[in-house]
Amino acid sequence: MNTRVSESSFKRLIQLVGCVLIIVLSNSRLSNAQSIEFPTCAKSEVLNTEIHLYVDESVLAEYSKAFVASKIATWESYSNLVLKNSCIPMTRKVTKVTYTPEIDSLWFQDLGAAERLLKLSMEEPIKEITEDGSPVFSGVVFSNYHSAFESRYCGVASQVSRFFSLAINCPDSTMEHEIGHLSGANHDYKKVLKDHESIDHFIAGSYPKAPAYSFGATCSERGTVMSYERDIIPVYSSPEIRVNGQQCGDNAHHNNARVLREFANTQLKLINSNKN
């Protein structure tokens, strides 16, 4: 049987933790004002995206529901900070959290199987869009990615749907990293070249074909959210962002902020066309 977190208490906790995180991150941003330069964002229509999370009930053997809720609130706030810093007209909001005993940690190894099994076990359908056509990203949350059949990855994103998985003990940037993949963003060159013989080989094998500018970046020994660096800046790669005077991207190869903006614009056009 599936259990739901009390909606009112969850929302209050999300608001509280979110406010605290925003204050902390804002102060951090101000303290680094001389070393990190963010662009001035132009006003535009905003795409509001929803996130539905399905939590392995065995998580509660290690963590309380309050702790899990605080982690989810942190992920949400981090995502919105990344989008804001990168001038991407989009928001994230976790609107549904479902605890279920149906999830098995072995699912972490095969996201496609996890998605199919979860859809079969849930009483309600798993949505990919809201009633007005806005995107819904669905994620399976595990307790520990190390114990999930010794997974090499802290999070995984589907190549064919808006489905992802991650663990409670993953870095706070992981959720936005995976949703970035679901929106068309790719890793930095260093990570891509560990798994492919060349960037051209990766692009040729991707479907839909990855734009040449869809890669993450490193700058001044730090990485953007799609990189695998230990020190992550809460931004998508963009030539408009600088760290210690060094650009965190370029127009030709490392501009995931553009990728996300194009995703937002495409979705908004679909939503608006359905209204007419």
Question: What are these regions, as identified by a protein language model?
Answer:
Residues 2-4, 88-89:
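Short amphipathic alpha-helical segments with coiled-coil-like heptad repeat character
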Residues 3-17:
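Bacterial N-terminal signal peptides that target proteins for export
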Residues 7-8, 25, 112, 257:
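General helical secondary-structure elements
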Residues 16-25:
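Bacterial N-terminal signal peptides
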Residues 31-35:
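Boundary at the C-terminal end of the N-terminal hydrophobic targeting segment
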Residues 36-276:
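Extracellular (secreted or membrane-anchored) zinc-dependent metallopeptidases
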